Every structure is written in structure tokens, then in C-alpha cells.
């Protein structure tokens, strides 16, 4: 395997669950005040792009645009108060970079929002290439983002690290190994049932998989 590591962002590098959940709550209160959304409803909107989520919830183009603009405004305002890196993420990425690994992000989040989160958490200097939802024509689980990152580095091999089944499916379609992380929402058993190559409970365990 080449020394290219592709990470999802939310739920993998950055703890953003509370940020995203609160953004959804405030957006729904403002834009859909007559509808009720449970915590289970909100959890179901994690993973798909917000474009897909708000298309599903909208009954008009006007409502869709209102949801999108409101969500983006609130999300950026809440970033400094809610976002942080998971334990051992920064130290592990720093070590891997010192060992010659190229580190990229392939996410279903917009590129400028990813960059903002990396800056707030001190990770931006460790990651050169960011593939976001606005970089590709089709988001994960389509493998387009993975292939774009591999092309950027002129590599035909890589490894994907992510917290969702969508990440796993994208890696499978791109025919690269996948490492599932358990500190977000998907359990070790769920990843194994879906055919993950590896599953880790702490980012530092990635070093063992890589022989470092």
C-alpha cells in the first residue's frame, strides 16, 4: 500500500456531533416550526449531505434555499464553541506526516467548512488535500472523491479511515482498504458485519495497522 491516508472529517477526526445536532435543532426551529424532530430523526440526518437532507424535507425550492442558508449561517457561528479534535488525532497525524505519509480528507461536507474546522482545532498544517461535497459531482458512497484524492497524489493505492458505513462503501467501491473508527456512532460489530478490513477504538491504533 502507498503512503496515502484518506480520512473522513466529522466523527473521524473532529467531534462535531453536538455541533451538527444543535445546528439542525436551531435550523428546524426557525424554518420548520410546525414540525417535530426527535433525536432519532436528527441522528438519521448524519452521513447524507445536507443538500440531500433538506431536499427530502422541503416542499419547495424556496424552503430548500431557506433551510440551506440558515443551516450554513448557524453552523459557522457555532463552530468555535462546539468543535474539537478526538483524542490522539493530532499526535497520530503529526507522527504519520513525519514518517512520510500523505494525509487527505474525503468528506461529504463543504470544503471551506472543513478547512475552518481544521484551523480551529490546529490540524490544518497536517492536511494538504481536502475533497469536499462541493469538489465532486457525486458524494460518498460514490468513490469519486477517493479517486480524486488518489489522482492528486498520483497514487494507485490508499487507505480510507472513517466513522460511517457510507465511508466503508466508498472505500469498497474504490477497491482500497478501510479502517472503521468506533468513537462516533457505528459499533465494531456493525463495521465487521459490513466487511471492514480493520476497526479501531483509538486513533493511535492506526499506527499498528500501518506497521509504525
Segments from the language model and where they lie:
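Conserved phosphate-coupling serine/threonine residues in phosphotransfer and NTP-handling enzymes
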Residues: 12, 107-109
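Asp-based, Mg2+/Mn2+-dependent phosphohydrolase catalytic module
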Residues: 1-3, 94-97, 111, 115-212
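N-terminal helical cap/lid subdomain that shapes the substrate entry/recognition surface
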Residues: 2-90, 99
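Sparse, context-dependent recognition of short Cys/His-centered cofactor- or disulfide-binding micro-motifs
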Residues: 27-31, 39-42, 52, 68-74, ...
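Residue-level marker of regulatory loop/turn positions in helix-turn-helix DNA-binding domains and
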Residues: 85, 106, 138
Amino acid at each position: 500500500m502507498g503512503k496515502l491516508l484518506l480520512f473522513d472529517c466529522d466523527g473521524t477526526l473532529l467531534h462535531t456531533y453536538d455541533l451538527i445536532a444543535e445546528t439542525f435543532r436551531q435550523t428546524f426551529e426557525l424554518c420548520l416550526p410546525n414540525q417535530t424532530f426527535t433525536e432519532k430523526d436528527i441522528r438519521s440526518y448524519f452521513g447524507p449531505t445536507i443538500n440531500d437532507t433538506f431536499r427530502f424535507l422541503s416542499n419547495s425550492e424556496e424552503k430548500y434555499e431557506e433551510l440551506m442558508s440558515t443551516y450554513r449561517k448557524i453552523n459557522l457561528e457555532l463552530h468555535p464553541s462546539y468543535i474539537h479534535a478526538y483524542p490522539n488525532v493530532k499526535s497520530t497525524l503529526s507522527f504519520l506526516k513525519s514518517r512520510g505519509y500523505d494525509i487527505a480528507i474525503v468528506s461529504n461536507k463543504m470544503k471551506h467548512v472543513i478547512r475552518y474546522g481544521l484551523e480551529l482545532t490546529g490540524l490544518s498544517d497536517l492536511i494538504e488535500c481536502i475533497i469536499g461535497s462541493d469538489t465532486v459531482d457525486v458524494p460518498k458512497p460514490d468513490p469519486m472523491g477517493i479517486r480524486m484524492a488518489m489522482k492528486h497524489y498520483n497514487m494507485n493505492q490508499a487507505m480510507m479511515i472513517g466513522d460511517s458505513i457510507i465511508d466503508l462503501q466508498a472505500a469498497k467501491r474504490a477497491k482500497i482498504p478501510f479502517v472503521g473508527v468506533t468513537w462516533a456512532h457505528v459499533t465494531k460489530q456493525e463495521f465487521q458485519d459490513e466487511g471492514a478490513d480493520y476497526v479501531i477504538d483509538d486513533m493511535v491504533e492506526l499506527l499498528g495497522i500501518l506497521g509504525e
